[in-house]
Structure formats: structure tokens, C-alpha cells
Amino acid sequence: YNNLEKDKKIITEYLISKGISANEIVFKAVQSRKDNKSMYVNGKYAGDEFLGYVLTQSLQIDSKNVETVEKISREITELLNKGIEFYSQPPRYYYTKLADLKVEMISKATADARARAEKIADNSGGQLGDLISAKMGIFQITGQNSNESYSWGGAFNTSSKEQTASITIQLDYLSE
């Protein structure tokens, strides 16, 4: 546990020196597992010898400073030179105003659907009547210019810095 606390201090100091504020560093709960050594007598398994516990702890950086986090993610192996066993993952990207974006996208998609329906009605010699039903599809976030496929349950890409958001709206109108 003392080693874990020492490493935590070194990691915190490192991240702060790289431009991350202390309140952006979130240490998760300490996880523990037993460390055993398999024992053999004359080539036959004779049980385990308990060696102690292995403690691990993960951390997360919650920051809006994307460039700083990306730079740190490329340089984080510097901690290995300080004797820290460290496993890192690539940054994940979240749009912080997603709720507002959804409302705006629903509004635009609805207006676009109506304009298309009016065009279809005009081109077929009819007129667009009253709206009889409206259905909203799944909100999708995919990597920009990626070949990610849309999903019935929705897609939520967090690995791409540049993302594309889409939604499908189905409007049913009476035809006159």
C-alpha cells in the first residue's frame, strides 16, 4: 500500500507538471487480489503458497483541455523511467453540450423532413396535409469519415476526436 501511495504522489506531480490541475485527476478505488505461487513436489501440484496481495489503482483525467491530454497520452511512458508500472489507454472524447445538440438536431431534422415531404407532394401533384405521426430514431455519434456502421441501439464513438452526430426523424403526413 505504501508503494501505491508513493506512486500516486509521483503520478499526480507528473500530471500537474504537464498542465493538468489536481481537480481534473480522479483516482479510482484500490483493487486487490491475492498473489499465490503454485507449489510442486516431484512434478506434481501440491497447492498454492500465499505470497501476499497485489494492489492496483486506476486514474482518470477529466479535462476540457484536449491538446494537453493528447500530449500527455503520447508522453506518459516517461513515468516508466520513474519506476512507475503504468498502463495507459488512448484519450476518449465527449461532447459536453450533447443535450443542447440533440434538441437542435431534432429541430433541424424535423424541418428537413417536412421540406422533403412537401417536395415529394408537389412533384407528385398533391399537397401535404396534416401531420399524423412523428417518430424519432436513435441518436448516433460516429467517427468523422469513418466506416462505422449505424446500430439499432445507437452508436456512441468516444475514440475519435472529430465526430459526426446524426438522428433520423420519421414524419407521416396526410396527402391531399
Residues covered by each model-derived region:
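Short, charge-dense linear interaction motifs
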Residues: 1-176
